[in-house]
Amino acid sequence: MAIYAFDGTTCTPRNLSNVFRMYDAYKSRHKFYATGPGSRGTWLSKVIESMTGHGGKDRIYDAFEIWKYWQTRESRETIIIGFSRGAVIARELANKICEEDGKVDFLGLYDSVGSFGNPFNMIDIGYRKSIPSGVAYCAQALSIHEERFTFRVIRANLAKENTETTVQECWFPGVHSDVGGTLKKGLGAASLNWMFEQAINANTNQWDKEALDEAEKSVDCEEEPSENKISLPVCFLRSLRTRKIKEGDSRCCADNPQLATRTTS
């Protein structure tokens, strides 16, 4: 049993993101956690990492080497989770593991956003974002209120040859960091509680019951979403078109009136 967790940009355990909460709730001694890009080193290196996502490949390399080490000793349940850029890092790790004929039991993604290389890079060269066939179950929580241009969400699309993976995606009220669990805790608990449910549906069972109960009782779907942060003007431009819920997409906290206003066919 092993979990590999990749946090979002600038996130550390102090932020208590949903990724860290899941990592902390997983009952195993085989646990890997990586802070988000922009959380390490000097002030200047943090700024550069925050803008470019630099360091993502180092995190993948470290996790992959640990996976190989653990796999040589016994076959084990493999869970990978990530938030924001960490969710894109999680996808690439899943692809590397599946290339080695490994299996991923559960891939949990919170609002995947790339922009590796520069804030306007939507290609993310070197990062495979499609879900490979070696992943048994993939779940992604999506933010409906995020409007920043460089925060375009990456949907959980299957690789061309993949007809096996179960995929569940669900839209939540709140901006990017609300869904990731670092701002509004009531909205963050909604996506966390849903992700725990998806992980259990994927037949992973090493979760601390107290953490599951705490997530469930903390859900507040009526909490007001946070404002989109506008700091660095170039990095945080608002998009010309907000994210839209398409026909057939799942909505969590569907009774939230602000969620209903974002629906489109």
Which residue ranges define each predicted feature?
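Active-site- or binding-pocket-proximal scaffold segments within functional domains
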Residues: 1-265
